[in-house]
Amino acid sequence: MSEIFLQVIESLTINIELLLQDLDFTTNKTNLLELDQLIICHSLLGLSRQEIADKLKLKSMTIRDRLSNNIYPKIAEIMGVEQKDIAGNWVKILNFLLNPQNGYKLNPAPQLNSDNFQASFGRQFFLYPPNQDIVKLQTEATKFYQLGLYYQALKYFSMAWNQEIKLYDVGNPESLIYINNSLIEYHKSLFQANQIRVYTIAVVVPFYHNSGKVAAEILRGISQIQLQVNWLTFNKFNLDKTIDLNSIKPKIFSTLISSPILLKILIVNDPNNLYTPYNQTAEKLAALFQELSLIAIIGHYSSEMTKNAFRFYADKGLVLVNACSTSNELTDLSLMSFFRLTTPDNTNAQRLADFLMSHIAEREQSKIALIYNHNSIYCQSYRNSMKKYLEAYQDKLIFLEECGYINESYYRVQKYIENIQRAGVDMIIIIPDGGLEPNSLNNAGLISRLNLNNCLIAGSATFYQENILHWVHEQNQYRDINQDHLQIIACIPWHWHSQENGCNSENIIAQYFCKLGSQLWGEGNLNWRSATAFDAVLVVLKVIEKYHSETSQALLEDMDRYFKEQRRFIKGVTGNIQFKATGDRLNPPTEIVAVKWHSQQQKWQWTI
């Protein structure tokens, strides 16, 4: 795109490419010359005929002739007026082009970023692949989105999506969200004319945690439900006939809601910083909610950030639906505007404790150690819950000295590991924080220094990471690990092979979740964070479907009425979803999973 075109787009928010294209298709069959295009652009930017002549080093008469003989007749035709009515009157022409009803006025995406806030409908990427060709496509896509050129943005987002599928067999959920957002913006007038309502949800994820892996897992669930909801409308208006959407078209379609609506997603980066005095991300997002027409917030990831952020949303009448934070402290957060899809620490700890005690039932006594981050309210919550349930079995357990500093130096944690090894530890419960301090998860890798065949390692849901599989694989290269008796487990809310809610269960929503997930991300690449994120959006959509909520305040009241007063439930990927008055789930799901060797795929996997 030429520099002068960009000037017109950025200064005037006019789709100059569309205008020039339409001018070439008037009854005056003479196509515009490059000179004509330059004259039009400079005229729109306010230059006089003489100034244009001087700039292009031409005679003023030449500019006059091109305007009179070729440019004005074409412009007059698309405006539906006589040439004499607009000749020389660029203010009138400009007013025509800036009238949204005439189709040339661009609607650029809002600039949201500042020093303490990063958010995107498509203006920027957070998840970049190693391949630089794909990065270039992503960069071009965001440039077009910034300018409000949504068709071009859509094409480049789609090319980036296709290239990642081709190279890695896994799509980028951020690209899929931006494809959906671009389609909504590009066809906005069509949807408005047909009274299709667009709902905007903000999703707050920690891109800095674990190299963006957790954010990607959450966004897979978000982008998948966005596509599933939007495709009903895209298909109704045959949008795939005008632009190639085969790469994202669901091969098997399942309807989640009966009435066609559209879902637009704002992706927000949460720095996830434990030592920030208050949540600036939440404060800024709450301040923007009216400007952005936000209906609800999905987030945050860590319990600490969720607790700090909640008051900003509550003060604005915004519903906060949480998919990943498990601390018991969140139970008393709100009686109205908070809903939690994942399983609280108290429930997880009880399930894990029961499993551990059944595992050692035949032993006289077992030595147990707890490793966690004492700075984290989540880790403290989980640790306290585990201690409460395990102390009921004091005659069967010997509690070794605890390690509350998994977040500190590698060498200090290593020394602790060596000490409990010498003490003959039988079980370790490891509770990394939710990415608040990077050493926490990195130090969890020290488990590979233990004799894994003789010690049971039990982790919380934050321990459920691909990193653990990589560490086991690396350790397997240096010493022989018994592939049948490796003892690493975790307690999580959902798994791909869950008997009740997995890919082969009787839960139809979970079945389709896995089938579409296989198409978009490859088999088995949806995990508990993806599933609870999907369900977090689903509870919002089900209430919108029933009450046709128009505003965030109306949605808050409708969700409170439906789930907390009437005690209604819906079916989601993670099973029946019903809430207590506190916003916690009734009978939340738990699954015990273990690291096992997959002989066919020749790799370690988390499995039931």
Q: Which residues does each predicted region cover?
A:
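An N-terminal, helix-rich hydrophobic module
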Residues: 2-107
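Extracytosolic ligand-binding ectodomains
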Residues: 111-608
